[in-house]
Amino acid sequence: MTPADLADLLRTTATAVLTERDLDTAALPATVTVERPRNPEHGDYATNLALQVGKKVGVNPRELAGWLAEALTATAGIASAEVAGPGFVNLRIEAAAQNVIVGDIITSAERYGHSAALAERNINLEFVSANPTGPIHIGGTRWAAVGDALGRLLATQGAAVVREYYFNDHGAQIDRFVSSLIAAAKGEPTPEDGYAGSYIGDIAAQVLAKDPGALELPDDEMRETFRAIGVDLMFDHIKISLHDFGTDFDVFTHEDSMHTSGRVEEAIARLRENGAIYEKDGATWLRTTDFGDDKDRVVIKSDGAPAYIAGDLAYFLDKRQRGFDLCIYMLGADHHGYIARLKAAAAALGDDPDTVEVMIGQMVNLVRDGQPVRMSKRAGTVITLDDLVEAIGVDAARYSLIRSSVDTPIDIDLALWSSASNENPVYYVQYAHARLSALARNAADLGVVADTAHLDLLTHDKEGTLIRNLGEFPRVLESAAALREPHRVCRYLEDLAGDYHRFYDSCRVLPQGDEAPGSLHQARLALCQATRQVIANGLAILGVSAPERM
């Protein structure tokens, strides 16, 4: 009996209890919640259903809890149901009913934990979207890990997800990048507002290798040559770094295309039709204050140049025209003001602001020997994705960045995350998978085969704890997807790995010496197979490997 099965049973039982007493069943919530008590002595699961419903139907919650407990006790699969406190019901599940979770996991395999909770959603997930003016910095690396994991997580719940990178190749930052490349190619110092780092010299040299006469061209042609070739080279490096990090995108959209394709003009025309545009001081303004923004925004400057928001408006309209019903933007801490701005822009275009969802990520700091690490040899100023991977590897880098809520600043201790110790969270989880894999190999050598026919033999308290936690995996995925919080998967896996290690230390899985394999060995091996599957499924969502050996 999974937690979902138990929730359904509770609702069915509550419906019968209320109907029998001529009480209004409409008071029942659409979804009944069951939780695992903090103190296992209180039972396997608990529900506050009587507290939710009692007052609505005019019955003391504790009395209603008593009716529910009495009915549940007489139900197959329920070992006991007891009233606690003002109206809680603590439940114990019969081992035979609880242990079917193991068989469900083995049967479902890679799809265990998947659901159709988001099957109707068509989601555009935009993340990283770093300017092609330098390597991915550590903040962008956090989004590369979290965004990719979130995309995988949403897909497990049935959503159609398109991962998109908005390629900012329009504006002043590109002009500064080009000036920096030209200065490097000429052997001149970096411009005051330019980009430093050895990568600038490398790209400048590659531009000259592709077009040896670039520096001899007229100024405008020279700048365009360095722009076209340099931006392509930089973006190729970014794509390779992201791919090596395990993050790939379905779509790359160029900001410049919003301006050259007429998309900006189309968006402004739509806004004019909606009465959301006005002219003042020679500029074109958007009435975003009518839709919750703190001030109106300039769309076209007085010199005729489009403001940055013009591209945002065109890009959002483009996404909606491609059929997305939810557009998730993952932005850095310095973009907090974009939340109201983007939602107001959606409303001004005549759309539902809830089609826009903005996630703001906080800072990432690296620490070595208790001291902050601030400089990158390649980038010159900031720590990059490549720096982090070189220091601790892809798996540890991804896990360390996903493990905390994005609205929390994080410090990554390079010594900790590169260590082979239980204090290293990713090592702890991966070691559990490797240990389970070794167990499977040893079982094969001994001729022991996992069998779910005798799961009723799994009665040890450590077995029960492990099985109940395995049953939580679908709920963890559903809630993590709904809340856009992939870090919940990390915390769950660490908890599950701990339950497995404690089970392994208390319950011998394989026969020893001349002992013949028995039904208990086979049942425990099935439990281990299920545990290994869930850990592998969770790590796959995070984009972290599940090693067979360590």
From Swiss-Prot:
Q: What is its main location?
A: cytoplasm
What biological process terms from GO does the record include? arginyl-tRNA aminoacylation
EC number(s) on record?
Answer: 6.1.1.19
A single Gene Ontology CC term: cytoplasm
One Pfam annotation reads DALR_1
Record's subcellular location: Cytoplasm
Motif 'HIGH' region: positions: 130-140
Q: Which HAMAP family match?
A: Arg_tRNA_synth
NCBIfam families to which the protein is assigned, alphabetical: argS
> What's this protein's family per the entry?
Belongs to the class-I aminoacyl-tRNA synthetase family.
Q: How does it assemble?
A: Monomer.
Q: What is this protein called?
A: Arginine--tRNA ligase
Source species: Mycobacterium sp. (strain KMS)
Q: What is the lineage of its organism?
A: Bacteria, Bacillati, Actinomycetota, Actinomycetes, Mycobacteriales
* Gene of this entry: argS
